[in-house]
Amino acid sequence: MAIVSKGILGKKVGMTQVFTEEGHLIPVTVVEAGPCYVIQKKTKATDGYNAIQVGFGALRERLANKPQKGHVAKASVKPMRYIREFRVDDVEAYEIGQVITAELFAAGDAVDVVGISKGKGFAGMIKRHGASRGPMKHGSKYHRRTGSLGAKGPARVFKGRNLPGRMGGERVTVQNLKVVRVDADKNMILVKGAVPGAKKSLLILKPSVKAK
């Protein structure tokens, strides 16, 4: 896992458009980022690596079990719906119970956004892999089917062959997205372009590892 200096959890609100100072209209995704709480600190001495454990999204008391309540009690916070880790260089820069807000990033920063893509269910070759369809007339019985699965010689299908199957619902990372605007009062971060996932789904924002 790559070591990052910071990171924040958020929720996808939706997409809109904003004008830049130059008058250009650009598409942006609105992310409700934070507030997140530092629940646990991990060090090389105790866990073998340096990281902070961050919680986001309040969970109703009756939906949390005793281990969950006990884990967050050390940080004096309520049970969290989402808990994720960020590997950091300096663990001592963070305190248990510390609040991480949208001010962690500023306009102009490059970020990587991680989310779970929308699930499409069982999909065929054309939708899932972008395959070309077959002839649609003159007696053809091959329209949207898979086609050849391989040669007669091996008499088997090799691993990695594009086939119909379940599509979407996977962890996707979109790199080098620009932060257009930050509204700390509303815990909002506007990111240029689209990000993976449905509305209200969990997103992870961290500094871009391939920033230009």
From Swiss-Prot:
GO terms for cellular component: cytosolic large ribosomal subunit. Residues 128-146 have a biased composition (Basic residues). GO terms for biological process: translation. InterPro entries: Ribosomal_uL3, Ribosomal_uL3_bac/org-type, Ribosomal_uL3_CS, Transl_B-barrel_sf. It holds the Pfam family Ribosomal_L3. Residues 128-164 are annotated as: Disordered. GO terms for molecular function: rRNA binding; structural constituent of ribosome. It comes from the Bacteria. Keywords: Ribonucleoprotein, Ribosomal protein, RNA-binding, rRNA-binding. Belongs to the universal ribosomal protein uL3 family. One of the primary rRNA binding proteins, it binds directly near the 3'-end of the 23S rRNA, where it nucleates assembly of the 50S subunit. Part of the 50S ribosomal subunit. Forms a cluster with proteins L14 and L19. NCBIfam families: L3_bact. This is Large ribosomal subunit protein uL3. The gene is rplC.
